[in-house]
């Protein structure tokens, strides 16, 4: 009888660490998902701030810089060149540019997988940026598609 009590006590004690490990594993999983969510939102916020900074560098920054390089009578024309280039590059990027740059195709030219931004949503794209939404990645890349021809004008 005494041995049976000890076996019962030992078997109950053996179950306690397993239950504690399960609870600890659940807490650890919850903490990891919280850290991942915080990291993802932080990454997204930084990418959006960076996108806005590049847009400001193109819009008022580059337009005013070029406006200061010309004579007084040509300032508006020079400013409008920069702003029209921004509008045109945005439309072209949304229609075909992103798809040709980042679609799956050859090593030099993508396919029309993302034509008119079809399939570009809020979920991360594991091929390019695993912690930010696909839309944020597309916007960030679009800013450089905007500023590149604006630098040439």
Question: Which sequence ranges carry the predicted segments?
Answer:
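Hydrophobic alpha-helical transmembrane bundles of multi-pass membrane proteins
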Residues: 2-153
């Amino acid at each position: 009888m005494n041995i049976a009590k000890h076996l019962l006590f030992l078997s109950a004690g053996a179950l306690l660490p397993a239950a504690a490990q399960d609870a600890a594993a659940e807490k650890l999983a919850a903490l990891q998902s919280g850290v991942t969510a915080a990291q993802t939102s932080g990454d997204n916020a930084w990418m959006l701030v960076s996108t806005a900074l590049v847009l400001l560098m193109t819009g008022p920054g580059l337009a005013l810089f070029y406006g200061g390089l010309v004579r007084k009578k040509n300032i508006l024309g020079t400013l409008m060149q920069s702003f029209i280039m921004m509008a045109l590059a945005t439309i072209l990027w949304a229609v075909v540019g992103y798809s040709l740059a980042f679609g799956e195709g050859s090593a030099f030219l993508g396919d029309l997988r993302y034509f008119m931004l079809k399939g570009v949503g809020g979920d991360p794209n594991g091929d390019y940026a695993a912690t930010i939404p696909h839309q944020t990645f597309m916007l960030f890349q679009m800013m450089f598609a905007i500023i590149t021809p604006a630098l040439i004008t």
